[in-house]
Amino acid sequence: MSSNAKWLNKVKWDEHGLVPVIAQEVGSNDVLMFAWMNRDALAKTIESGEAIYWSRSRKKLWHKGEESGHTQKVHEVRLDCDEDVVLLKVEQVGAIACHTGRHSCFFQKFEGDAKEGDWETVEPVLKNPETIYK
């Protein structure tokens, strides 16, 4: 599949050629993570049926789970009303989406009020990240 496919032109890419992506678990509707895609990543995601993102730090395509085995099988791809955010409905293989070894990257919850509040960890580590990554 070409990253010049007509359907890719509908996406409003930012000035760096990227679009924000939210990965949501298809069964539970849990928000698992936030990442970025370029045209190539989105085209390869559609083609392969697994989530492939763009790593801004490494400046390369990143097949989610390539090291850990915690891949994301894509069930749906949606584009928001402004056409500038992509939602992936995924099946998270191995139940771990976060590099910290947790189910979701959104494991910190704000508790309290504006003056005395703080971020609390509300999800357990399911697997030690040192044993996940080589």
UniProtKB/Swiss-Prot annotation:
Pfam families in alphabetical order: PRA-CH
Key words, A-Z: Amino-acid biosynthesis, Cytoplasm, Histidine biosynthesis, Hydrolase, Magnesium, Metal-binding, Zinc
EC top class, in one word? hydrolase
The pathway it acts in is: Amino-acid biosynthesis; L-histidine biosynthesis; L-histidine from 5-phospho-alpha-D-ribose 1-diphosphate: step 3/9
One example of the protein's molecular function in GO is: phosphoribosyl-AMP cyclohydrolase activity
Keyword Ribosomal protein tagged? no
Annotated positions binding Zn(2+)? C81, C98, C105
Q: What cofactor requirement does the entry state?
A: Mg(2+); Zn(2+)
Positions binding Mg(2+) in this chain are: D80, D82, D84
Q: List the disulfide bonds.
A: none
Q: Which superkingdom is the protein from?
A: Bacteria
Q: Which GO biological process annotations does it have? A: L-histidine biosynthetic process
Q: Where in the cell is it found?
A: Cytoplasm
- Co-factor binding comment: Binds 1 Mg(2+) ion per subunit. Binds 1 zinc ion per subunit.
- Do you know which InterPro entries this protein is assigned to? PRA-CH, PRib_AMP_CycHydrolase_dom, PRib_AMP_CycHydrolase_sf
EC number(s) in its UniProt entry?
Answer: 3.5.4.19
Give the GO cellular component terms, alphabetically. Answer: cytoplasm
Reaction(s) the record says it catalyses: 1-(5-phospho-beta-D-ribosyl)-5'-AMP + H2O = 1-(5-phospho-beta-D-ribosyl)-5-[(5-phospho-beta-D-ribosylamino)methylideneamino]imidazole-4-carboxamide
Coiled coil region boundaries? none
Q: Give the record's family classification.
A: Belongs to the PRA-CH family.
Binding partners and assembly: Homodimer.
Its function, per the record, reads:
Catalyzes the hydrolysis of the adenine ring of phosphoribosyl-AMP.
Spell out the protein name for this chain: Phosphoribosyl-AMP cyclohydrolase
Species source reads Herminiimonas arsenicoxydans
